[in-house]
Amino acid sequence: MAVPNNAAPTVPVIPSDGPHSKFVRYAHAVAKEHPPLFPITPATRPLVVGLDLRTLGPQPANYEDLVHVLRRDVVTPMLMVFADDDTGLAEAWMQVCEVEERFVIDYTDRARATRFMDAMQFGVSKMRGEERRCWRNCRTFDVYSEIDAHDAPTTDLAVDDRVRAAVLAAAGFGLGTDVIVSLGPTVGRADVGDNDIVTTVTPDDLHPVFGHYLRMTGNRTVAEYRSVGPGMSVVQKMEPPSVTEMYDIGLASLLGWLDMFRLVACQLRDVQAVAEIDTVRTRIRRAARALDEVVAALSRTNGRDAAPSLDTIEFASEAFDREMLYLIAIFDGYGRAFLRWLDPASGGDLRKSLHSAKTLDDYVDPNYPGAPQLTRLRELQRFAFACSQLRNRIHDAVLPTGSFTNRTYGSAQAIAIDLGQTEVELTQQLVDRLGVWRATPPNSIFGQPTTVAEVATTAVELFTASLEYIDLFTHLIMCTKPVNAPNAAELLGKVTDNGFRPPEPHPTEALYRQLFRWSH
């Protein structure tokens, strides 16, 4: 017998002694003396850092922060020199890094290099003093360096510099280095194909790589300070209670205005505003975690390989989707909170988002006319809008992500998003910053080129632009009274910015900024 629609609803009986049904078919934690089945911190190995001593020079004392990282027990330094370098180049580095070996690359110039078919080959010797402990043969296609030079948008790099970078990358790849620290002119350049094989960074840029390593391995020790006294050695550690709090501290170092805004809300005892700001901060942390997982997945790819594995593409794609969903949740939540703060008693429609230009047109521009932040906010809103268009595709269908060739030679492929199957509206600034190019799908012989965006670059640039957008918007509304909102919450415009800025950040803040610096 059917229940009539106008029947009184039955009040559910909710047990107070715990749930009466549970899913229990999963392994539980064992005693603490036994390892967990699925540990938060997976089995890991040290970060292997190659050092290009020809460009760094003989004095490690010039690189105090770099040495601090190299002396960590989770880092394995490899000292790399060329056969014609000064014999004493590595001596001081061996002492500070507490290693006994150096790796000698038997390469001087192209004319004297041996050949193996189309490849240039050279040896790398592991030396302890004058004793050779082992030797390996490495190869690189120097013609690729010539093609890179021909295709490059600028002519500021000599072919010999490109070939030397190729030799260094081939040696590093053979030795198992994760990253090479160098001051060579090819460091970090997209038009140098060998940066797809082994990442090269400046001494300062090793810190973000190391910070990502710490977060992905669950290592909470952000710094170690050693002191040696008579008969003893002391190591002091800077270690937050959890990886989650490490993210919170690191992101707060990048979002100073948002951090201050929360303090203002706490002082005003605006509980709802504090909760809204905390929600924004939590979503930023989760977006950052998703970004880190995108980069971690891409660490399984290499420019020597023909194509990334299907599992790697899936892992990176899922993490990128998650990042976009959290970024849009940030813009939506902050936009709605801002409208409520403009008129707390209105009770009107609050479904507005900071990703929308219309929100800036209708609510920001009229309340902050002539504000110096508006021009930059408009530029950053384009990045937020790109996030929303990618999010829309995620909701409608699967975001098309796959592998595409990203050089005019060879068969190596990069993971990229096929923007041709989305509605992302590209500006020249987005093209330049998101790593966009025209590519033909590798499995489509007669296919038409499509517009794609390199997933690592897109993930990093959208995230960093979003952080700047949120922090700049926070500065605007915290330090400026809205002119057309007579009933605005006290929170808006509560702080007077007199222009003072500390000349230098606190050392701890500076350290976290280095470890959480995803882009330059």
Residue ranges and their predicted role:
Residues 2-50, 54-68, 72-73, 85-278, ...:
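Acidic, Ser/Thr/Gly/Pro-rich intrinsically disordered interaction regions
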